[in-house]
Amino acid sequence: MRVRYKPWAEDYLKEHPNLVDMDGAHAGKMSEWFDKEQPIYIEIGSGMGQFITTLASKFPEINFVSMEREKSVMYKVLDKVKELNLTNLKMICNDAIELNEYFNDGEISRIYLNFSDPWPKKRHAKRRLTYHTFLALYQQILKEDGEIHFKTDNRGLFAFSLESMSQYGMYFTKLNLNLHDEDDEDNILTEYEKKFSEKGSRIYRMEAKFHKSI
């Protein structure tokens, strides 16, 4: 989906430094940004924020971070955070390749990758969020028993991700080849997921972990 540029979005986000990190001010000290010291879950590529804001509302005992590089959609997440008065959700406006600039080693308990850009052309494979260079970043910031939760409607990206994670030495704790056939009451829909499901698209989901170091 092409995002329409909104020239005012950056200034709007900058008006809320208590909620949005635009310039790396909290890099390396994310835990201090929250009111309480709690486990941290992050979503990379939050879009308009339906998933992450629903999670933060449902689980106040968890701290959440929304990471989104598009300022022109991130303002929608900010609006939801303000509307719901969420104190356990902060936002980073940056690219996933900068993850280790923000988070310390072993600081994160869970990473969500929901409907990431599949980058279907082979020459763009390194941009996929399950490419091995990104997996190395995730391994660095995740706790030893940390998890990656992944959802997509793109069969090619799902197959690529299974292979990439397996080759990296990860293992899978859950695999769903048609998520909505299983009527999972705990599943929280993203904006894309709702749209794709209504069209009858198959939703693929997995949960994965890194093997513990010996």
Curated annotation (Swiss-Prot):
Binding site for S-adenosyl-L-methionine: E43, E68, D95, D117
GO cellular component: tRNA methyltransferase complex
InterPro entries the UniProt entry points to: SAM-dependent_MTases_sf (IPR029063), tRNA_(Gua-N-7)_MeTrfase_Trmb (IPR003358), tRNA_methyltr_TrmB_bact (IPR055361)
Active site: D117
EC number: 2.1.1.33
Swiss-Prot/TrEMBL keywords: Methyltransferase, S-adenosyl-L-methionine, Transferase, tRNA processing
Reactions catalysed according to its record: guanosine(46) in tRNA + S-adenosyl-L-methionine = N(7)-methylguanosine(46) in tRNA + S-adenosyl-L-homocysteine
Keyword Translocase among record annotations: no
Functional pathway: tRNA modification; N(7)-methylguanine-tRNA biosynthesis
Cystine pairings recorded for this chain: none
SUPFAM superfamilies for this protein: S-adenosyl-L-methionine-dependent methyltransferases
Recorded GO MF terms: tRNA (guanine(46)-N7)-methyltransferase activity
List of residues binding substrate: K121, D153, T190, E191, Y192, E193
The protein's role, per its UniProt record: Catalyzes the formation of N(7)-methylguanine at position 46 (m7G46) in tRNA.
Protein name listed in UniProt: tRNA (guanine-N(7)-)-methyltransferase
Lineage of the organism: Bacteria, Bacillati, Bacillota, Bacilli, Bacillales
